[in-house]
Swiss-Prot record:
It comes from the Bacteria. Residues 1-380 form the FMN hydroxy acid dehydrogenase domain. NCBIfam families: L_lactate_LldD, PRK11197.1. Its EC number is 1.1.-.-. Substrate binds at residues 24, 129, 164, 278. The gene is lldD. This is L-lactate dehydrogenase. The active site is at residue 275. It comes from Escherichia fergusonii (strain ATCC 35469 / DSM 13698 / CCUG 18766 / IAM 14443 / JCM 21226 / LMG 7866 / NBRC 102419 / NCTC 12128 / CDC 0568-73).
Length: 396
């Protein structure tokens, strides 16, 4: 299969992966309206072409939390990454490290903190949920700090798991799920050999280390259902600060008032995110929410964004809408499932090239020069009425 764009990796991953795994990352909540709008809204943001600007000294480098990044991109936390490629977290972290960008390890990774951290040179980031078991949270923070993790990504938009109907049809959950997963695995030999047999153990590495016993996919599903804490509040940030003195990023912000609260409570950054459309269907896309949030807190806190980013043009669009850096999730997981570390490395190269083309043709020599001036301001005349708020910097 020819890979010429990031979108090609999705088609390749669908061929390689058992359906329960492909649809787990590809799907969203309920009718998947927000999942679709994430991509569609962002793709319709019109860039302003400029020419004859002498772009010979273009640079994608940026700095975030005193870390130099080769481009304003980090790999997002993705649960069960090690089920998509053999020791997937290690491979993805290696690709990010080689490209000079951060890798974020999920709470519910297959590979534990202690397996991933020693394999890379730059400090990785660690993602944490608010859980009923505060002992686990404290243990995870202490282990992340001991392993040299530099930044904590605190996910706050999951006090309860979203309803993902596609999972019941694919075999991730629903009737006879274990039997359906087994049959899917044996009928996808490339995955079965590389990951199913040679990628063991398929534990939830960080949780197994805490519990002192192996954990599997059924444990993952049950643990998610029973451990998320609906009592989460801003006071939990104060508790976390007792155990974490590094940069802390609040992931799951869609409203300007929540962004202001993050500033007031001393967070170092926020991620404008709807969890990739996997939590509450019908909320704003990140592209729609971002301009108003940037108007509210730009300069007071680092603004990251995810959800719907599929290529280098999307990265430039998100930065023009107000983000400082973006997180890639699904896009890199498709590449990882297709070709492991080499796939992620190639994806990052594609994104870098696409960013350079977009910046060259919009006249932005550096990341700091990408702004709303890089967009067509009369979007209400160029785009459907539903996207007009993007031009004005207001949420719909």
């Amino acid at each position: 299969m020819i890979i010429s764009a990031a979108s090609d990796y999705r088609a390749a991953a669908q061929r390689i992966l058992p359906p329960f795994l492909f649809h787990y990352i590809d799907g969203g909540a309920y009718a998947e309206y927000t999942l679709r709008r994430n991509v569609e809204d962002l793709s319709q943001v019109a860039l302003r072409q400029r020419v004859l600007k002498n772009m010979s000294d273009l640079s994608l480098e940026t700095t975030l939390f005193n870390e130099k990044l080769s481009m304003p991109v980090a790999l997002a936390p993705v649960g069960l990454c090690g089920m998509y490629a053999r020791r997937g977290e290690v491979q993805a972290a290696g690709a990010a490290d080689a490209h000079g960008i951060p890798f974020t390890l999920s709470t519910v990774s297959v590979c534990p903190i202690e397996e991933v951290a020693p394999t890379i040179k730059r400090p990785m980031w660690f993602q944490l949920y608010v859980l009923r078991d505060r002992g686990f949270m404290r243990n995870a923070l202490e282990r992340a700090k001991a392993a040299g993790c530099s930044t904590l990504v605190f996910t706050v938009d999951m006090p309860t798991p979203g309803a993902r109907y596609r999972d019941a049809h694919s075999g991730m959950s629903g009737p006879n799920a274990a039997m359906r997963r087994y049959w899917q695995a044996v009928t996808h030999p490339q995955w079965a050999w590389d990951v199913g047999l040679n990628g063991r153990p398929h534990d939830l590495g960080n949780i197994s280390a805490y519990l002192g016993k192996p954990t599997g996919l059924e444990d993952y599903i049950g643990w998610l259902a029973n451990n998320f804490d609906p009592s989460i509040s801003w006071k939990d940030l104060e508790w976390i600060r007792d155990f974490w003195d590094g940069p802390m990023v609040i992931k799951g912000i869609l409203d300007p008032e929540d962004a202001r609260d993050a500033v007031r409570f001393g967070a170092d950054g926020i991620v404008v995110s709807n969890h990739g459309g996997r939590q509450l269907d019908g909320v704003l896309s990140s592209a729609r929410a971002l301009p108003a949030i940037a108007d509210a807190v730009k300069g007071d806190i680092a603004i990251l964004a995810d959800s719907g980013i599929r290529n280098g043009l999307d990265v430039v669009r998100m930065i023009a809408l107000g983000a400082d850096t973006v997180l890639l999730g699904r896009a890199y997981l498709y590449a990882l499932a297709t070709a492991g570390k080499a796939g992620v490395a190639n994806l990052l190269n594609l994104i870098e090239k696409e960013m350079k083309v977009a910046m060259t043709l919009t006249g932005a020599k550096s990341i700091s020069e990408i702004s709303q001036d890089s967009l067509v301001q009369e979007l209400d005349k160029a785009l459907p009425a539903a996207l007009a708020p993007l031009a004005k910097g207001n949420a719909a």
